[in-house]
């Protein structure tokens, strides 16, 4: 919580509080109303308080007609200075900025003083390689402190980074390098993931070979992560330890509206979308939501986030906002359940994390192992569990609250996207605790975010009437400022503003209940149409995972000559349960009980579901296998064995039909 906000909260309580039970909701409504009615003043005060500026802005925001919002126009700052330098003249100088561990037991503690030293080394190396303001640098790194440092070094020079998730293959990497026009690629020789060596430099070489003479890359800067022998191209490839010498590099001031980074969304077909985030607005918006929605409002708060630096969460809530606000982050270079199921709990206990950030799928994965693993650890430091990336159904919500949090944590579920940069719907436990609701109920529109639900005609829906989630301008500061290589905004308009002109449509299905909570039901394009009824895949999965035997589930719609689409469920059971026809019937009845006879799913038991390495279930892959089609881009697939599981289940289903 900021100082001004604390004062306002106290004043409001003294003046307006009539019933103590209503206090928190009253304050949320007051704060939200203020943010919507006076967005320039609301965000302007926060920007002054939280961020260090070289030059003040001339205009708080400029709303492009029918498009996006530009914030803090005319202001100048540097992201690296805000995340590093400004902490050195305070008590934070020797405070831990990063706690890091690998799956092999390697450990590092990086203080803010260390961070300053390392960022300058990397910035000096990049400058020696010719990187200057406005250049693009592709970062293809594992989840290490060096991956975070590389981002800050690029930003220090006023250049633009484009981080590519280390799980992507050569073609996906090549596409992103080419689209960004990257002058330099930063990578590591290799790293370990679930005990297997992943050779990153080899993939970079393959990507550049694909591009051939069309490659924009002049240099490849290689960090020796494992010491693995790698191919080396003289004149192009450079080892970091040969050029990474310390020299103070003055942070380059940039306009608040200039790009800080490009982050490509992982579409299944077509050209990847390069989402561009600004420097000023992005730093302000993400910092505010770190304090409010992630709840890191106290100086000694520690954030353990299981995301990756290649995703937007890894930009906003592993790299920038925690460091800008001088907090400590915990990062683990592997899956949270490797090499043993309670590794994540061990990390929380060891580093006394106060906020644990993860996905609903990750929680469901951990649930499979039971409660005993969790109970071995003292997790009393936790105040808040943050989940995002997909709908959170009841079972993982309850497990997180009761098993992980001992009934004492706040479950801060959020909705946001790569495009929006930070949370737009959820709770603000860093300010006040609002009553929690479980299931697909995400929470409320967060301050500064005009979020609602509309029908096909673009009119606001009634309570509990399903429709389309939309955002109205002015959009919050951390939201994207455009798409790379889209100078006339044609692709931007077609992708986000064509369904409802002037209104941002992210593609999700939602409703608002009678208490004002927004329920996000999942992607509109994942809606299953059964006998003229629109059913969200997430709705079905929420009900299925409330069955005591079910750990995880994925629902997909398959064309059916009678119903239009039939619901097929792929179910992972908890430890101690075994697949059987009787259990399949139980699960079917469980779904029928809550959703009616129209939704009687076919149940397929599998040991694992295909997921991305960020923990999202790849429903399109399941559907493709079911229909005998190509699975498309599966470079982010965590475990290819999960594909075999689906294929096996489909074959067994087909055999049963022929018997």
Curated annotation (Swiss-Prot):
PROSITE patterns: AMP_BINDING (PS00455)
InterPro entries noted in UniProt: Ac_CoA_lig, ACAS_N, AMP-bd_C, AMP-bd_C_sf, AMP-binding_CS, AMP-dep_synth/lig_dom, ANL_N_sf
Record key words, sorted: Acetylation, ATP-binding, Ligase, Nucleotide-binding
Keyword set includes Ligase: yes
Known catalytic reactions: 3-hydroxypropanoate + ATP + CoA = 3-hydroxypropanoyl-CoA + AMP + diphosphate
Modified residues annotated as N6-acetyllysine in this record: 616
Enzyme class: ligase
Transmembrane segments: none
GO aspect biological process, one term: carbon fixation by 3-hydroxypropionate cycle
Pfam families in UniProt: ACAS_N, AMP-binding, AMP-binding_C
Active site per UniProt: 525
Keyword ATP-binding belongs to the record: yes
Domain of life: Archaea
GO molecular-function terms, A-Z: 3-hydroxypropionyl-CoA synthetase activity; acetate-CoA ligase activity; AMP binding; ATP binding
EC annotation from Swiss-Prot or TrEMBL: 6.2.1.36
Family statement drawn from the similarity comment of this UniProt entry: Belongs to the ATP-dependent AMP-binding enzyme family.
Task performed by this protein: Plays a role in the autotrophic CO(2) fixation pathway. Activates 3-hydroxypropionate to its CoA ester. Can also activate propionate, and to a lesser extent acrylate, acetate and butyrate.
NCBIfam families per the UniProt record, alphabetical: Ac_CoA_lig_AcsA (TIGR02188), PRK00174.1 (NF001208)
UniProt-listed PANTHER family: ACETYL-COENZYME A SYNTHETASE
Protein name, per record: 3-hydroxypropionyl-coenzyme A synthetase
